[in-house]
């Protein structure tokens, strides 16, 4: 997914 927050490849997409 690509949400912008959370883990960078598990569920987030961004590192914020």
From Swiss-Prot:
Gene Ontology CC terms, in alphabetical order: extracellular region
Claim: Kinase is one of the keywords in the record: no
Compartment list: Secreted
GO BP annotations, alphabetical order: adaptive immune response; blood coagulation; innate immune response
Keyword Ribosomal protein: no
Record remark on domains: A long coiled coil structure formed by 3 polypeptide chains connects the central nodule to the C-terminal domains (distal nodules). The long C-terminal ends of the alpha chains fold back, contributing a fourth strand to the coiled coil structure.
Function: Cleaved by the protease thrombin to yield monomers which, together with fibrinogen beta (FGB) and fibrinogen gamma (FGG), polymerize to form an insoluble fibrin matrix. Fibrin has a major function in hemostasis as one of the primary components of blood clots. In addition, functions during the early stages of wound repair to stabilize the lesion and guide cell migration during re-epithelialization. Was originally thought to be essential for platelet aggregation, based on in vitro studies using anticoagulated blood.
Name assigned to this protein: Fibrinogen alpha chain
Record gene name: FGA
């Amino acid at each position: 997914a690509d949400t912008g927050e959370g883990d960078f490849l598990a569920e987030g997409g961004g590192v914020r």
